[in-house]
């Protein structure tokens, strides 16, 4: 983005055309605005050399260095910028590279992301790049519960090789239910706590109410 912005500024000055914009850089700005609407006006500062961006927090707009953002925010910005760059190269004939077609593979989309971002990342990708097909891997229940079962594949390695199947349900499930029903966790609690709870229920089943009460308190 440093070099591209330099070229954009040189063209403006050389041609005295201050409405000129670089197509690739403009596409990056547009994609970030769609994908991360709380951010705007990403730009380069020369003294000291850095990349700044405006972020709206609780209704107030503040300017931050990109280095001040969380790892998740930086990863998402880098990912979106890289997709746009590749879309621009692959579709030079399009006035809007974000409408280009492509197949995009992303491994472990949830890495470094806050649960709020894990929840929204797939829908924001498909809204920002509507003509692209995304093949995404994840271990996050927050991602899975926001994907329709027809678009979700559970992969398991068996003695016969790799098995792929749609779950019976995914969209709208709680994170705990996804972990237990789709990802094989027997409990989301610490194992020792689960064992203690099971022991209490067993005492109640045996009508050992006093012992059960002592175990609780």
Task: Briefly describe each language-model feature range.
Residues 1-74, 81-98:
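Extended helical coiled-coil dimerization/tether regions that scaffold
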Residues 13-17, 64, 163-164, 185, ...:
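Residue-level detector of alpha-helix boundaries and kinks
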Residues 15-22, 112, 187, 206:
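Charge-dense, low-complexity intrinsically disordered segments
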Residues 34-38, 86, 150, 185, ...:
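Phosphate/oxyanion-binding loops and surfaces in catalytic or ligand/nucleic-acid-binding neighborhoods
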Residues 52-183, 192:
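Switch/communication elements of ASCE P-loop NTPase nucleotide-binding domains
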Residues 167-217:
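Acidic, Mg2+-coordinating catalytic modules of nucleic-acid enzymes
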């Amino acid at each position: 983005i440093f070099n591209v912005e330099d070229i954009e500024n040189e063209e403006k000055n050389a041609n005295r055309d201050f409405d000129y914009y670089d197509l690739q850089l403009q596409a990056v700005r547009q994609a970030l605005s769609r994908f991360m609407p709380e951010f705007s006006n990403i730009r380069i500062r020369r003294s000291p050399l850095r990349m700044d961006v405006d972020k709206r927090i609780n209704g107030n707009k503040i300017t931050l260095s990109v280095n001040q953002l969380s790892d998740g925010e930086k990863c998402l910005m880098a990912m979106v910028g890289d997709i746009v760059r590749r879309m621009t190269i692959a579709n030079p004939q399009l006035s809007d590279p974000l409408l280009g077609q492509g197949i995009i593979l992303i491994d472990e989309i949830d890495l470094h992301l806050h649960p709020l971002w894990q929840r929204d990342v797939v829908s924001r990708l498909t809204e920002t790049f509507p003509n692209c097909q995304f093949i995404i891997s994840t271990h996050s229940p927050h991602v899975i519960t926001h994907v329709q079962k027809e678009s979700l594949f559970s992969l398991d390695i068996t003695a016969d090789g790799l098995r792929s199947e749609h779950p019976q349900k995914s969209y709208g499930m709680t994170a705990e239910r996804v972990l237990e029903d789709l990802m094989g966790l027997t409990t989301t609690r610490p194992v020792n706590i689960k064992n203690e709870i099971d022991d209490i229920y067993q005492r109640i089943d045996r009508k050992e109410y006093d012992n059960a009460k002592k175990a609780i308190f």
